[in-house]
């Protein structure tokens, strides 16, 4: 990748719009689930999987099953995304409510 394309890629990354939403990580082997929220739910899996592969994930409850069953037994699901024009002041509270709702539905742990 030449210098100009790299600069363009970095600029595009910095200018992308947030995608606020709720996601789940599910272990196929045990049926365990973890639910979290993100301001970039569309790219959240990359960061999670990176930390889990290295063994440096801040989520110990997720790291242990990952180590026991391996990456192939896990899946990432985007459960819900807030619309782009959702009011900024109530966004955090709404994400917490929706996370709690999905945790109850899936009988999941918090991320």
Residue spans for each PLM region:
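Structure-specific nucleic-acid interaction/processing domains
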Residues: 2-111
């Amino acid at each position: 990748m030449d210098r100009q394309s790299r600069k363009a890629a970095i600029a595009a990354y910095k200018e992308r719009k947030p995608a606020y939403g709720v996601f789940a990580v599910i272990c196929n082997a045990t049926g365990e689930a973890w639910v979290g929220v993100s301001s970039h739910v569309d790219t959240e899996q990359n960061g999670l999987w990176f930390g889990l592969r290295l063994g440096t994930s801040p989520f110990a409850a997720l790291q242990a099953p990952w180590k026991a069953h391996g990456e192939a037994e896990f899946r990432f699901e985007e459960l819900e995304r807030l619309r782009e024009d959702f009011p900024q002041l109530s966004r955090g509270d709404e994400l917490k409510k929706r996370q709690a709702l999905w945790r109850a539905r899936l009988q999941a742990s918090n991320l």
